[in-house]
Amino acid sequence: MTDHELMQLSEVVGLALKQRGATLTTAESCTGGWVAKVITDIAGSSAWFERGFVTYSNEAKAQMIGVRESTLEQHGAVSEPVVIEMAIGALKEARADYAISISGIAGPDGGSDVKPVGTVWFGFATSRGEGITRRECFSGDRESVRRQATVYALKTLWQQFLQNT
């Protein structure tokens, strides 16, 4: 996806949120705030983007958005339970309507047989108590994995929560 197409996707998501009078928050690890960046590239995004949390370290995940240390120790940062807690914690801290959380292994190092480089977990939650998780394994270099994760997060929010509601 080109930068222009990514901007168009951000605009579509933003318009849908604005039409609902809803706000979005993000909790990002491996993407390092890339989702928040492409969202805030859109003029007027303050109407629907509340805030973004870049929680790269486990300590940041625990301190900023309340991910339990026991969850991190038991499952590791790149896991379904962690992205669930990240999304719920971001919603709570930001008092937003929708949350996206992302934690993954962008590479080139850090992968294992169980969690290879390119593994990314996503969490999506709403203030209405809805939520889903997704796991993807992207290929390519570090920047490519991070870009693909950013695109996937926005597309999934759109398709699962905003498109037909």
Residues covered by each model-derived region:
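Short alpha-helical segments enriched in small residues
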Residues: 1-165
